[in-house]
Amino acid sequence: MKVRTLLCVCALLFSLTVAAQFQPERYPKREFRAAWIQAVNGQFRGIPTEKLKQNLISQLNSLQEAGINAIIFQVRPEADALYASQLEPWSRFLTGVQGQAPNPYWDPMEFMIEECHKRGMEFHAWINPYRVKTSLK
């Protein structure tokens, strides 16, 4: 009886060992290595559209080289928007005047989505839902 039990246990262990070799490979969870690009630090205001686009592209290239795989981009700094919106005015941090559309016209959020995806980066829109005004000039 003991020999029979021992043989059954050995057969079971052998079966489990063989079955374990055929399990699908488990991949580690992908790391979220993000950088935050904010609008309220003044990097947008007063800069011509093409220069601003080049600055953003340069930032994205540097961040990609550093291993960043996601961008968190501030799209609503103060109850306004850095994207075309039916509800919110254009941000003063983009044009210098709240409610004034960029000239020449462009949509910073759309631009950033396209540029992030060209680099295989995730894009995350960050909003300030409650901030109405800051003391920044």
Give, region by region, the residue ranges found by the protein language model.
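Bacterial N-terminal signal peptides that target proteins for export
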Residues: 1-7
